[in-house]
Amino acid sequence: MDAKTSKEHLPRAVWALGLTSLFMDTSSELIHGLLPVFLMVTLGASATALGLVEGIAEATAQITRVFSGWLSDTLGKRKALAVAGYGLAAATKPLFPLADSIGLVLLARFLDRIGKGIRGAPRDALVADLTPPEQRGAAFGLRQSLDTVGATLGPAAAIVLMYLCNDDIRTVLWFAVIPAVLAVTVLVLGVEEPAHLESKTKAPLRLADIKELDSAYWLVIGAGTVFTLARFSEA
């Protein structure tokens, strides 16, 4: 099966997951592109406060991811967890234009990143569960491609909307609510939980299992850690 044929015959739910990622990334990146200006110019935050907000937000997302995969396997309710994660993120979007203090922005970012941490593992597991083994590469590639499209559309929309709204940043931030709601709607209506997950197997989280991980795993983890430490904040 060639790449074109494989992509055309991917399950409808995989396309729905991809569109969910596209819409949510459009919403998130629209906000993130304007957030430093909003914090420092509109709310009068310092560079230190901006760094604190972003540091707490990203740390929250990474820590939450550690447990979301285990929870997804244990409960076998991947769609429910994904909806919870995307739903929480969508619920935070109105908080940004409503914010009149740095504390409210921090709360919004904190909850938004919890949502991101919750949804990542069950969403990717859903892609694998919904797709035949020979199509999984194409399925993951499609979802990530649509995610990247959303990450591009968000900042582009911010530029256009700031121009059209005469630099009224609060009005522009309200527009981010629309794609966030679309993301949750597509996920709820377009994805069904695979039937075989109903007969799930419990997957206890045990520290002793770490000893079973081979050197190749730790090499990848080590490389990822180094690159992450070297990454600059996008704020």
Question: Can you say where each PLM-predicted feature lies in the sequence?
Answer:
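Transmembrane alpha-helix termini and helix-breaking/packing motifs in multi-pass membrane transporters
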Residues: V37-T42, L153-L173
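C-terminal membrane-cytosol helix-exit motif in multi-pass small-molecule transporters
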Residues: V177-L197
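Structural signature of the two symmetry-related core transmembrane helices
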Residues: A80-L95, V177
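Helix-to-loop junctions at the C-terminal end of transmembrane segments
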Residues: T64-K77, M162
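Juxtamembrane intracellular "pre-TM" segments in multi-pass secondary transporters
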Residues: M1-R12, E193-A223
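Cytoplasmic helix-loop-helix junction between adjacent transmembrane helices
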Residues: A108-V149
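Helix-loop boundary and gating motifs at the non-cytosolic
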Residues: T5-A61, A216-A235
